[in-house]
Design a protein with these regions (language model features):
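C-terminal ends of transmembrane helices
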Residues: 20-28, 97-114, 162-171, 242-256, ...
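Interfacial segments of multi-pass membrane proteins
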Residues: 282, 334-343, 415-437
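Predominantly late transmembrane helices and immediately cytosolic-facing juxtamembrane segments
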Residues: 245, 359-363, 435-471
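Transmembrane helix-loop-helix hairpins at membrane boundaries of multipass inner-membrane proteins
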Residues: 1-10, 20-128, 208-213, 504-509
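Cytoplasmic/organellar membrane-interface segments at the starts of transmembrane helices
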Residues: 210-211, 258, 375, 386-391, ...
Length: 512
């Protein structure tokens, strides 16, 4: 379905453009009014994506009319289809609700910074950067063109860098710079590959908004000697963004020390976009070369799952544990993609949504504990908090269920799809490889379950700690956004077919 006006892109550009006014409005309006404006700006793209998803049932792509066309660059449009919808809905849901959560949390953070005599820009600047970051992420997953994708990818990097540098914890400026350098280098490596493809093919479109078809094999226009190196460059650049083992160094620092509302966007939403781009961009442009690279990607995915799980298990800082957990979860995402099966890739896209819900709940739980326990993040100093904070404990449990695949969580369906795709793919190659896969998955799933529920026990149950004696339940201004995210996750567990069925249909065609 081609729209008459570019509604999808308006959901990206309107929030970005209007967010520039927030620092000026912040001088005359109160923090609640600024929060409400930011919430409404982000509610708009969420409403658009949900409306078109329900209206079409994702049985056909929803495409904006071309808003820009050039003989050398191709055309700029926006696409909502079964592949992009799980990400667009997840980004819209989490960013909108975390905007509301930011009000009470950042009140606490501003008070902390004032006590520490740290100066930072005010509410208007915070929400301007927050809205830009959120809308740019939406822009990346709706893009149809390599240049368009790269612009939004970089636009998501700069505001998130400033949010960490201005409002983060610890050595926030140094950590923000590390985050900027690592992820910008990854984006540049991806850009180099993109430029070679676009200049060789005469277009940067990886999806044709006129024919409503992906430009499969567009990379074949590249010289045969360069095809594999270019494909490797694009994949490697995305691996940095995905924080795969070996290029993950930046993530535990950035995600742990970012202000918690930003952590709740970085970990579930931003990094997973690179997994989507592996399928939407890298596989579309270089199907043969990508297929060859999956022989190396699959074992790397398993190593990432295990490494992230082991490191999470060793952490005492709750936010740092969640950061390493995200590395492990991105391993599952890569595992599904590297199978190049319908089930595996469908599972990876559904896992993005499951991880978005689960990790958003867990980072916001960490934020609640920071606010209610006066900045406490050390798990060893917690314990026995559940009787004092039963609602927070319940929401944290739902979050852990999503990342471990326990019903009623969407993570159950993503895990089943990824494992079935991986088993089918590896079994067709060799029995020994299949046994190795089973062993690695048992270790990985065991580690995920261990760090999730040991952490749950250490924080919320057991002997009451000194912190537990002083604890009290958070207010609804913190808990209500979390409860809505949790409810959305359970709804998708009950109604997964709205995402999975169209995905299976599209991937069956895409993979041939």
């Amino acid at each position: 379905m081609v729209l008459n006006i570019p509604l999808l892109l308006s959901g990206v550009l309107v929030p970005i453009v209007l967010s520039v006014l927030l620092p000026f409005l912040g001088r005359s309006l109160g923090k609640k009014s600024i929060t409400a404006i930011a919430f409404i700006l982000l509610l708009y793209p969420l409403a658009l994506t949900v409306f078109f998803t329900i209206q079409t049932g994702l049985r056909e792509p929803v495409v904006d009319p071309v808003i820009f066309q050039s003989d050398s660059l191709g055309s700029f449009s926006a696409l909502l289809d079964p592949l992009s919808a799980p990400l667009a809905i997840s980004i819209g849901l989490v960013t909108t609700l975390i905007a509301a959560y930011s009000l009470p949390y950042m009140e606490h953070r501003f008070e902390e910074m004032e006590k520490e005599k740290i100066s930072a820009p005010d509410w208007g600047t915070y929400y301007m950067l927050y809205v830009m970051f959120s809308a740019a992420m939406m822009g990346t997953v709706l893009s149809t063109n390599l240049v368009e994708f790269y612009i939004f990818l970089e636009l998501s990097l700069l505001p998130s860098f400033l949010l960490i540098a201005f409002y983060g914890y610890g050595n926030r400026e140094r950590i923000a710079l590390m985050y900027l350098i690592w992820t910008h280098v990854g984006a540049l490596v991806f850009l180099i590959g993109s430029l070679i493809v676009g200049l060789s093919a005469g277009t940067f479109d990886f999806y044709d908004p006129i024919s409503l078809q992906p430009n499969m094999g567009l990379g074949s226009a590249v010289s045969p000697a360069l095809r594999l190196p270019v494909a490797i460059a694009m994949v490697l650049g995305l691996f940095v963004k995905l924080a795969i083992l070996g290029v993950h160094i930046w993530l535990p620092y950035a995600h742990a020390e970012a202000p918690t509302p930003v952590s709740a966007l970085l970990s579930p939403n931003l990094i997973g976009i690179a997994g989507y781009a592996l399928v939407r961009v890298a596989y579309t442009l270089f199907p043969d070369e990508f297929s060859h690279l999956t022989n190396y990607m699959l074992p790397l995915a398993l190593l990432t799952i295990i490494y992230g799980g082991l490191m999470a298990l060793a952490q005492d800082d709750f936010k740092r544990l969640l950061a390493y957990s995200s590395i492990s979860q991105m391993g599952y995402l890569l595992l599904g993609i590297s199978t190049l099966t319908t089930a595996g890739i469908a599972g990876a896209m559904v896992h993005y949504a499951a991880h978005a819900v689960g990790k958003a709940l867990l980072f916001t739980t960490a934020g609640v504990l920071i606010v209610q326990l006066h900045g406490l993040r050390s798990i060893s100093k917690m314990g026995g908090i559940a009787p004092k904070m039963p609602l927070t404990a319940s929401l944290a449990l739902i979050g852990f269920m999503h990342i471990t695949g326990i019903p009623p969580s969407l993570g159950l369906w993503s895990e089943v799809l990824i494992i079935s795709g991986a088993a089918g793919s590896v079994l067709s190659k060799s029995a020994i490889a299949f046994i190795g896969l089973l062993i690695a998955l048992l270790i990985g799933i065991g580690l995920s379950t261990a760090y999730a529920f040991l952490t749950m026990k250490r924080i919320f149950f057991g002997q009451p700690s000194e912190a537990a004696l002083k604890a009290k339940e958070a207010g609804w201004n913190l808990l209500a956004p979390m409860a809505i995210i949790a409810a959305a996750g359970v709804l998708l567990f009950i109604w997964p077919s709205i995402l999975i069925d169209p995905l299976v249909s599209l991937l069956s065609s895409l993979l041939g």
